[in-house]
Amino acid sequence: NTITVSDGISMGTQGMKYSLVSREVIADSIETVVGCLGYDGVIAIGGCDKNMPGCIIGLARLNRPSIFIYGGSIKPSSENTDYVTVCEKTGEFSKGELEESDLIHVEKISVKGPGSCGGMYTANTMASAIEALGMSLPGSSSQDATSEDKQKDCIDSGQAIINLLDKDIKPSNIMTKEAFENAITVVISLGGSTNAVLHMLAMAHAIGVQLDLDDFTRIGKKTPVMADLKPFGSHYMSELNANGGIQPLMKTLLDKGLLHGECLTVTGNTLAENLSNVSPYADNQNIIRSFDNPIKTTSHLRILYGNLASEGAVAKITGKEGTS
């Protein structure tokens, strides 16, 4: 095991100064143990903002047959609340707009088990990016933490790592420039977190792939935002999982020529081979819009340059901003 920290606990405190640093500590820890003990292959399990890219950075540096397993999302409560609801209600209570008994009720029901924040926040964004990158098994990014699907994901990953060892398939065979472009495309189509930008730049650097801010702008000009997911949308990752996860979305993007189907994945097959038998979303679902009727026709992520950030900065367009 290595360390991890929760931004959910440290947000708004001095503790956030340690958050991004923890990513490097995690990567260094994985590299140190595996390098010292001579492991032939690695399965890394993560499930929060910084430990997921930390795992991938460590696996990239080691470049031994590897798989990432996402720990999974927290399921929303019976009243459709989650961790973020608690934060919002705490703010309402602080302003005198909510009774203490109502706040306590929300606190008691909203986080009923393990897992990462249930919307398209950083954890689910990075889980989706890693699946699109090819470093986790198909379906891993959307499964609930306590589900039978997640247990099967773990078992299947154990079988898959043997195949990777037999074929000597390493992260450098999977994490190519084209694979990172796939990950960026999927993140944009899902309306993912701005943190994906800084994490994917670091992940690419670790594996020796040249990736920069302009790649996000270039890809964003042709990639629509199609997912109605929290925080700017209405739905949770568990709802998307019930409708097929991100695989049908990736199939659509592949069919539209926005993904590189030739990229190798931890299944031992290419992305196109993994997606060949994936069925489209049901017509009556309203979580993922059609390609021709997106929420936004171009990326919600914006790369900015100016006197405050001469080397670049990232911003996110949310809600109905910039949709005209």
Predicted segments, located by residue:
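Long, structured ligand/cofactor-binding scaffold of large enzymes
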Residues: 1-70
